[in-house]
Amino acid sequence: MIQESSPDALAAAAAIGNALSYNGRTVDKSKIPQYNQSFTSRTTSIAGINRYTMLSNSRTNSRMLLMNGNVRQYSKRTSSLPNQGHKNTSNNSAGRRQHRAHEDAETTFREFGGKQSSKVLNISSSTGQNSKSRTTSLGNSGSTIRTIKKYIPGPRGLMAVEVPVEVEPPRYSLSNRSNQRGGRAYSLPTRNNKTSLMHRNKTTKKAGSQEKKSESGGKSKNDYHGKVLSKMHTTSLKQRHNNVPLIPTTMNEETEQELQEDLHDPLEFKPMIISDDENSFIEPSVLDRSIPKKDKSGLSGREKKEEIETLLKEVHSLEEKISNIEIAKLNEEEREQSLILELRKVKLDEERRMELLKRELNIVKENADLEAQELKLIESKRKQHFHKGQEVASEVKSITIRQPTLSEPKPAYVPPEDVEKEPSTLSNQTQNIENAENIDSVDAEGNLVDPILLGSLNNSNFHMNSDNEVRCIADSNSLTGSELSDYNYIEGSATDLRATAKTSVESEIGGNQVGLKIPQDDDSEKQEERTKGKKSGLVDTNCFLVQKEDQEEALSDNEPESSEKFPSTSGIENVKLEDETGSVMDKNNGPNNDKDDDDDKDNDNDDDDDKDDDVNDDDKDENVDDDENVDDDDDDDDDDDDEYHDSYDVIMRDPVQIEQDISDVPSLKHPSEYSTETEDNKKKEQNSENAEVSQSGTNMAKYLRGANPYLTNTSSDTFSLDSENVNSKSSTDTTRVAPDLLKSSLQPQLRSDLKQSAVPSSTSSSIYSIETSPNIDSSTGKTASNTKTNSHGPPTSISKQKYDQSSSHQIPVMSPKRLDDKRKITNRSCLRTLRGSSNEATLSHNIVYPASDSSSSPPYHSKKPSNPPSSGNLASHEASKCFPKAPQASTTSRRLPDHVPLYIDKNNSALYPKEPPARKSSFEKERPAKDNLGFRSMSLREPLITKNATATAAENLDVEEKKEKGGHVSRKSWTFGLPSPLKRRTSHSTHTTNETEIVNPMTNFKNKTNENDMPILANKKSCNNDDSSPYTASSMNTNDVSEAGTEGHRFSLFGNKSQLSNRNISGGTATLESSNPDLPTALPLSVPVTIIDKNGEIHKLHNDDAAIKDKSHDRHGHSKFGRKLKKIFGRK
């Protein structure tokens, strides 16, 4: 017995495989299907005893059977089994074997991984047809031996193994047994027909689907044991073991609907309900409705199966509808919930945004309120400061210094530290005023204005008595320290400012007395007038500074009150000045005297200029020293004043500092010159400032133009100066500005030159003007014009030389060895005429002069292959070898140049052959006699050429046709009749400029014993041809070659490159070629070329001398090319 696979075993293995978990190690018992037979526990104890006694033996025997691979060993080792030769077995032994088989199957499945149903698989209809029982020989006990299958785990699942068992005779009646045998394989058990029908239908469908797969897999040698189990075996098992289940509980099998769902969703496993009720998987009412009572006995199994399937389909459809409805409801609920959540999120976001916006609005409102309050405070402070500034300015101008006499020389007064921080104009004026004050004080009651710095005073009057004591009288209307500290830009207190002013004045009076000069008594009146002028100028200057700042503040505030405040400030200009006569100017008439004050300012400025010139002339050395020490004093003063900042400094000093920075231009001269020039410039700038302010109060542009010496012209028109001052200023300004002007004038000039030199056409550049010559452009233009004219005009001497060089390649000079070559051909080819006299009319029409394509011709050694001519084109091909073809009246020619040179330069006559002059007519009979030109005496109208041309052509055609019919072609002739390895170019009528000539340097072979040497004719284009090789080979007519070969005459080609026109040979239909460039390019095909006698000598018409020369050279000269042919073709 040989083990083989069975569909039942595969079905079981598939069931277990489906029940396996994902890891493949454990089996889900709920997923194992229930098979179609249900058993109850057996009550007989004898059968149970027999079953359990044989359990151990069956296990050991089955394992040994698997190990040895032979089923027959099982029967030999079992003592209860009879001989294999007997075919009769007892019923008891068969029953015991069946019990063992069931127990072995159960234990095997348990060992494999889980429980298995105890129901026996039914055989499908395909395998159940062969239901013949397997019986063996009867044993001594009368029992029969049968074989059953055991399922053993294998590499692909469970493997079925057939084991022989003893079958006991049935205990039931024969009628019952016959009824069961007559039934189908799908017959229902006796207990419950309905349930067994469903079980069988389901399991048969599974087994039948997998049976087809298993049958193709493993077939054994004996197909009889692997196809089916007998009906006898099935019925006996049903009868004997109907009540012996292997598993105590039953499992409900899957319905058809569940099976379809499993097919749709194979990964979803639905557990089966296991219960003790056998019919729990389906309601009996369904079966009662599906099967009518009257038809229960008459319906077949197939009909019942169909009805059940229809019912299951309906149920499945209903369940699908219900599930779809439920899914839709769930989806709607989920959507509603998601929408609700989104709405909540949106609401929360909106609420948060509203809160943020509210907070931002509140913050903005608070900031706006704070800003409004700040603006109000700033405006109020500005107003207060503006009023206080006016009062302080008016009070400062009313300060007087009392000096009783001039007898006591007092130290010269030097302006305080803060004055040096002011512009240089104020310092110079202050020094001059102090000199005047010290000299012009005659009376003790004389009150003079003390030029104390505006920023160092804080609304208090300083009075200097005769003892030089300083008293500080507080004013009731003066500002207090607390009021000043309220403003953001003002620091310090009133008392501090007063103390600072006092100490600064005292220190300056005691320390700086060197730079002042005391004038003589004679000049007292003059000094008094100047002092008055200076006082008024100083006051005007201070008033100007205060008025300027006030106007700027008023304009920035854009308040209507500013228009009312400016007139009140004009009262500051009216200062009470007390001279020695006691005359006092009224302070209240300021608005009425504005114009007078302006005129006084101009006059005072002129006087100041005169005075300054005198002082500078006298004290030049002292001023040099003072000017050199100005920077050191300024640094010290800055350090001292950084600690105290007066409110008036903020108002009045800052614009002056800006003015000083703008007008402070460095000088390139000696310090001594610089001191004098700076003083003049300072005077000039002050005058210009006063003039600009009087015209437009707050025009900063005009002010800057007047302050900057580079923006203003130093002419007398701008400043009202005296002639002396104009001359002195113009000289000093020119000396001071000239180096700068020279320096600045050089740099822009260099830039302009560089910039212009970047342009190619620039000729004004100082750098590139020498190199950029106009001759270059002219020579370039001449070159272009010459190139253009040369391309279109007639050829010059240079082009002639180029043409001569190109033509020399086309007409090379031949070696003298090849000039001596002779040609011998057969006697029958004495006279060869070219066919076709119909083209004679075309001779006189087209005349082409030589070397027409020499300019575009390729090199001499280039080669171009072509195919041999056909028989139809052979005549025209041979005619083209004799004479060049004439170009037809076609516009498609690409090789004719536009201009053909008619002569060659005489200087090149030694290197190149001289070309004949152009013919006046195409009917000339003779040409100039030249040794190196062929066909020199031939003409187009010679009688010998045209005589009997048609008759001879016809005769040659007849002879050639007869030879072709006779087939007399020697081996050597057809060898040379094939296309030669030498390249050629065929002549066609479409190629208008083709001229073929013999150029192959082949001579007679040296071995004269070979009588069958063949001529190889090659073609070459003349110098008119562009792109063909000079060495071109043409195939011959095979019949003509055979004629030439059978005559026994030797001949070969010639290869003299210098006298190509003298090399004309005919063989077969030998083509005659010429390189005479003077001939026209088209000749009639009927023109005979040469006459060859019986001895093989060539006689040319009108060229006997050349023939004699060729004959003399034939004996001596041999071509190297012929030697190469010997090597190629094996000639000896």
Swiss-Prot record:
It is a peripheral membrane protein. Disulfide bonds: none annotated. Residues 76-95, 115-142, 688-699, 710-735, 774-810, 827-845 have a biased composition (Polar residues). Residues 550-561, 595-644 have a biased composition (Acidic residues). Component of eisosomes, large cytoplasmic protein assemblies that localize to specialized domains termed MCCs on the plasma membrane. Present with 538 molecules/cell in log phase SD medium. This is Eisosome protein SEG2. The gene is SEG2.
